[in-house]
Amino acid sequence: MISKSTIEQVFETARVEEVIGDFVQLKKSGSNFKGLSPFSDERSPSFMVSPVKQIWKDFSSGKGGNAVTFIMEHEHFTYPEAIKYLAKKYMLT
């Protein structure tokens, strides 16, 4: 079982732009980042990441969320698996 403090540390530490940047090539666009959707085959970037709000939105598929939900969607992980993945990435365990 994952401790509540580990979950809190993951949400405090994981930067959405760093997590997504491991899978998607992001380009700075004002205060946000944009890139091609990892969930669809597209030529024009419709995938946006907001470091300020710590959220992402894929306008081609309608999906969006935070660093944890991105890992869940992209890697087909459960919530506990995504938390464990991010805890390991940020050396929180």
Language-model segments: residues:
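N-terminal structured subdomain of primase-like DNA metabolism proteins
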Residues: 1-93
